[in-house]
Structure formats: structure tokens, C-alpha cells
């Protein structure tokens, strides 16, 4: 999950002449639009963290080729911002609950939810277009600093949870 440099190819695609999908930015002679792939790459690139944390369910990683029941997850610690960032992808057809347990923290280091960013579409093949450039964009919901023990991740959603943890190095 920590990527110091990333290259994504193909980057640009003209709407009247392209070789393959997905491309990050589509354009014609006058306009451009960010694709769904662009926003996913942006969410990862802007939330890399400094240390990778374990993300498991029932002791098994929520990663790899299989995930668990359509769930895939990663977690990182950002030492500069003093935040834990949890990213969860639910590729299944149903909403799923994810239990969040921050092992290894002192009781005084209760994680405070900062915000939740969700990226969702009911249609797996939908994308932004030149005529509708904001059909699918990340939605950010700020939080009041409350604790969050269980996250409800809708079907076909990429969700990112940022938690402030004071007193951790």
C-alpha cells in the first residue's frame, strides 16, 4: 500500500482514438474528464501513510487474490498526521459490516474518526464521460471525532476511513 512513485499507463486517451481501457483521463479537442480509475489512483496516492499495518478478519488477511467474501482491505499509519487510514473495497453484491479493532493502542489512544471517503456506483461498468464528468466521484463525509467500531461498507464500494490517534509515535 505504500507507493513512493507510481506510473499508470495508459494515462491519456482521445475519445475518437484509443487502444485499450482503462485510461485515467479522457479528452476530445475541447474537454477532458477524469475516469473512475483516476479517482481510485488519487485516493491511494494521497493516503499512503508511513507504515503498513495488519488488516485481518478472523486472523486472515483481507488482501491477495481472494480477499474474504468480496472484501479487500489495507491499513497504514501516517506518522506525520498521526492518523490510521483504513481502505476497504467491497466487490460483492451486498453491503457488509467490517469490525475495526485497533490492537496495540493504549486506552488513552482511542482512535477518533476524522472522515469517511466513499467511491460507489451500482453499475460496475459506469464511468465519467465528457458529457457527465462527475457521474461518479468520491464523496467525503466529515466526522465529529467519534469512535467507530463497525463500518458498514455498501456493495460495490471503495471506502476509506481516516482516524486521528493522539499520543502514538
Summary of predicted features, one role per range:
Residues 6, 41, 86, 116, ...:
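Conserved, mostly hydrophobic/aromatic
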Residues 1-75, 80-82:
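Aromatic/acidic polysaccharide-binding cleft in carbohydrate-active enzymes
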Residues 82-90:
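Short, well-ordered beta-strand segments enriched in hydrophobic/aromatic residues
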Residues 56-70, 89-169:
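C-terminal beta-sandwich/jelly-roll accessory domains of carbohydrate-active enzymes
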